[in-house]
Amino acid sequence: EERELSLFYYAKLVLGVYGYESERYITTYTFKDNNAIEYIGGNNPYSEYFGNLHAYLTILGGENITVSGDTKEFIGFGGEAEKPKAMEFSNLSNKTGSIYDPCLSACSRIKLKPHEVKEVVIVFGQDEQENIIKVIDKYRDINNAHTALENVKKYWNDLLGGIRVSTPDRSMDYMLNGWLL
């Protein structure tokens, strides 16, 4: 039988040095093309470090993306990230603006036939606004997403894999090799 799933992604926005200082200046918004949401974005124009950059989030490969820029909608009033309120619903409200506790959250629907496999790409980044659609369009091709993932893995392996140690404790080896050395 066919199954329909909702895939969610959530990111709390700081866009400054300290969230408690910067969140009042953050505005979230949606970017639409032909009345369809392409991505949710956020910007803090007063940030010395992030002022000209926009954080953005989208989910590629699903259907009917909905978004929210309100942490209280996603997590729930007094809620916790481990059990977000949004999981009780199949989509988000598309609320954005400067009056909310800022976040970028997105939901996309996925329909699966029996034994069917689908890949989705979550694109979450920060860039100048005019570059965002170019980045999203690049990763609409799943092969570009796979290549980027392999490049990131190679980068970190090359950077962190120069020294290898072997101890009697395998868990210590995992911790030391690549991260602490």
PLM segments and residue spans:
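Extended glycan-interaction surfaces of carbohydrate-active proteins
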Residues: G161-L181
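Solvent-exposed loop and beta-edge segments used for protein-protein assembly and interaction
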Residues: L7, Y100-P102, P114-E116
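Short amphipathic alpha-helical leader/targeting segments
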Residues: Q129-E130, L176
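Active-site-adjacent bridging/hinge elements
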Residues: S90-Y100, L181
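Polysaccharide-binding surfaces and accessory modules of carbohydrate-active proteins
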Residues: E2-S90, L104-A106, I132-G162, D169
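Hydrophobic/aromatic-lined pockets within catalytic cores
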Residues: K12-L15, D127-E128, L180
